[in-house]
Amino acid sequence: MNYREYQQIVRRKSRQISVGPVKVGGDAPITVQTMTNTPTDDVAATVAQIHRAERAGVDIVRVSCPDEAATAALADIVRQVNVPIVADIHFHYRRAIEAAKAGAACLRINPGNIGSAERVREVVAAARDHGCSIRIGVNAGSLEKHLLEKYGEPNPDALVESALEHAKILQDHDFHEFKISVKASDVFMAVAAYQQLAEVCDHPLHIGITEAGGRRTGTVKSSIGLGSLLWAGIGDTMRVSLSAEPEEEVAVGWDILKSLGIRHRGVRVISCPSCARQGFNVIDTVAQLEDRLAHIEEPITLSIIGCVVNGPGEALMTDLGVTGGGNGRHMVYAAGKTDHTIEGAAMIDHVVELVEQRAARLREEKAAAKQAAE
């Protein structure tokens, strides 16, 4: 947890809604989302992909429902997974009604393209009857014609105006279980739009940089955009959009939250870039450790530093640490203090064992605390 004054983030106050059993907004944890890319009517493939995202730590998963076959498959999908499902709906209001009946926890819609006021009323009624929340999803790439004519191009003002227009549609139907997103592929536009929206409403915000790109460029863009917003206290749920597998989006989302001290899950490795002073191959060691420790869910910090220039100092701030030494022997730190040395050949196996032992202790402590509270 953050404990230094300069690490504190003051989160924007927002109302709280429910996405199935998961709370979004208010004082609820900032949740990590992803979206499947399988054909939704391929139930086996979609469920398998969601299970991989679950293992990566996802809180909420969105699936596209472009046709009746997709919504027909939704009930089977919902029954086989352990996280709430958001149905992504565009244009076809009947798909939203079908998804609500099938057990979707949330409907991602754009009230402006669902159709007439009567159709919007039917969608809202279905959401209310089946306990669904709604996400108003505004995107710079699909703004309404009248806003493009008014502003000349997509910009933050247009995104916010679209969002507020759609929010009013739901509010006019006395429906308030909704969250809002105003996404753009341009980081400046997206951040400015979310900043403006955060000033004029208290609805929970789903943040994201849309069409961010591939694994490397998308991670960088999302980290800049989402990191800036989260640092400013803006955002109640988030998706990192990558041209990559959903579980990779989840991993990056968690890394952003961990980097800001907002949520903690798994092993956070602090490592040096390596140089000629390294006492062991830092790059290879870190790659192996990250792979072998990927199954750990308990929050543990681990420093892997190749020499004594920064190693002891970094170890002061981590649960476990290794600093490269001479003659193939390296110092191991526990809770910031020197503990013992280890030979290079055995180091990786030894560190994995230490981390797994600490994770087991944390699980035992958590179970004991839970039992004591009951």
UniProtKB/Swiss-Prot annotation:
Binds 1 [4Fe-4S] cluster. Its EC number is 1.17.7.3. One of its GO terms (biological process) is isopentenyl diphosphate biosynthetic process, methylerythritol 4-phosphate pathway. InterPro entries: Dihydropteroate_synth-like_sf (IPR011005), IspG_bac (IPR016425), IspG_bac-typ (IPR004588), NO2/SO3_Rdtase_4Fe4S_sf (IPR045854). [4Fe-4S] cluster binds at C272, C275, C307, E314. Pathway: Isoprenoid biosynthesis; isopentenyl diphosphate biosynthesis via DXP pathway; isopentenyl diphosphate from 1-deoxy-D-xylulose 5-phosphate: step 5/6. One of its GO terms (molecular function) is 4-hydroxy-3-methylbut-2-en-1-yl diphosphate synthase activity (ferredoxin). It catalyses: (2E)-4-hydroxy-3-methylbut-2-enyl diphosphate + oxidized [flavodoxin] + H2O + 2 H(+) = 2-C-methyl-D-erythritol 2,4-cyclic diphosphate + reduced [flavodoxin]. Its cofactor is [4Fe-4S] cluster. Converts 2C-methyl-D-erythritol 2,4-cyclodiphosphate (ME-2,4cPP) into 1-hydroxy-2-methyl-2-(E)-butenyl 4-diphosphate. Belongs to the IspG family. This is 4-hydroxy-3-methylbut-2-en-1-yl diphosphate synthase (flavodoxin).
